[in-house]
Amino acid sequence: MFELLLGLLALCLLLAHLARKFDVPFAVPLVLAGMALAFVPGLPEVEFEPELALALFLPPLLQLSAYRTDFPAFKSHLRPILLLAVGAVLFTAFVVAVVAKWLVPELPWGAAIALGAILAPPDAVAAAAVLKDLKPPKQVVTVLEGESLLNDASSLVLYRVAVAATVAGTFDWGQTALAFAGGAIGGAAIGWVVGRLAMRVFVALDDTLHDITASILAGFAAYFAAEAVHASGVIAVVACGFMLGRQQHHIFTARTRLEAKAVWSFVEFVLTSLIFMLIGLQLSGVVERLERYDWTQLGLLALATSVALIVSRFVWMFFIAWVPRRLSRKLRERDPMPPAAHLTIMSWAGMRGVVSMAAALALPAGFPGRDIIVFLAICAIFVTLVVQGTTLGPLIRRLGEVEPDIDGPAPEQMAARRQVASAALEAVEDKLNDPEHGAAAVDLVQEYKERVDEAVALEDGREPEREHAAQRLRLRLEALEAARAKLVVGREEHDVAALTLLTEELDLEEEQIRRELGETA
């Protein structure tokens, strides 16, 4: 099994490279490859333990998404985010349940609602994987990422209540509402507490490697602590991620932030790649258990369910955008109707993934319609990832909603850079009359004045100054290359520790220059 895991990772790396080369979301070839491998004779069957999948994959990926989220933008878009994360989940679950009950009358209502809850939430991992290389409007990205952080909680609460109701034979909507409210509040509180405790741990550890390890463990701690008291582990992880993301500049050293980014990027790539591959690998076992069914009927059922899933999101998206503003003049004035293009993009960006698969496989043995539900979950993941995932980019470009490419840093980035440079200049100027630091301050003032002038020129877009600043930065890159080449040629003359230190300094300086040029993310 270990050899198979290494082989899957190698294949994921190849597919990710090909996906970038052919400009397709890399989640798509991963799922397709997993489905193809599922029918390769002689390969060992890969068991997908659903509880392990939720516990292993969700906490770090959700924590990282929350950590990177623009929290002020998240708060300013909280209304549409909640309308999608809660309202769209409930509406979609209801539509899918009605369609499933209509097409499969023998399916109990509880099982049909469980199916709806399984398929309702667009997946955070899938959304991030598909949107990563696209450039939709920032407002669209904020709402979609915010939705994907919270919708798993609402869908899992509805799913658990529906499963329990099916087993017990009764369904209580009041219990569902109470469970959702309690789970959300409890999860948020536990995530906040774990985040605060984690910050105390970081201060006590004061070591880069230990801090990074503790930051990874914090998400798992929040998830398991919340699940232990039947609160929402998803909300707990998101709350913990928000807390750490907001406080990272106070609790982490510069070295910790730089090295943590590399570690988290690696973790994200490995977990994201494996989860999509594992989703595809589940197809073989499901097909074997469905041999007794009429495949024409199953195909029509899968098609109808997937269409209901996609159409219901369009209906809900345009309904919540149009009806409340039609009824409230204050809302229209405070929050004008978003462009139809934005609504179309958000409606089409409803890819399903790990949560839907894990929830379907977590259904108890003997659950009514379990095999059909698992089959429909795989079909929905396949359709939304392959159809919507591959066409989302062309749709965004066709609607003309691609953020324009900017030669160099974005204006808002340069505004922040100017403020930082101005603050640094003021701090140095304050030391000009200091007997202890005056001479050194005189030397630094001119350097920081040049940085401020350069930032102002780039922010205002004045072409001559902008081009001159860019030429200076590129010349500095050439100088760094010459310095690095000298180190390589004379590496036998230098102590290994000194060589390593100088190389790190040159690498950091190069990264800073490339960021100023806008050449790195």
Model-derived regions: residue spans:
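Transmembrane helical cores of multi-pass secondary ion antiporters/exchangers
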Residues: M1-P411, A415, Q419-S422, A497-A521
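Cytosolic C-terminal regulatory domains/tails of membrane transporters and channels
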Residues: P404-A521
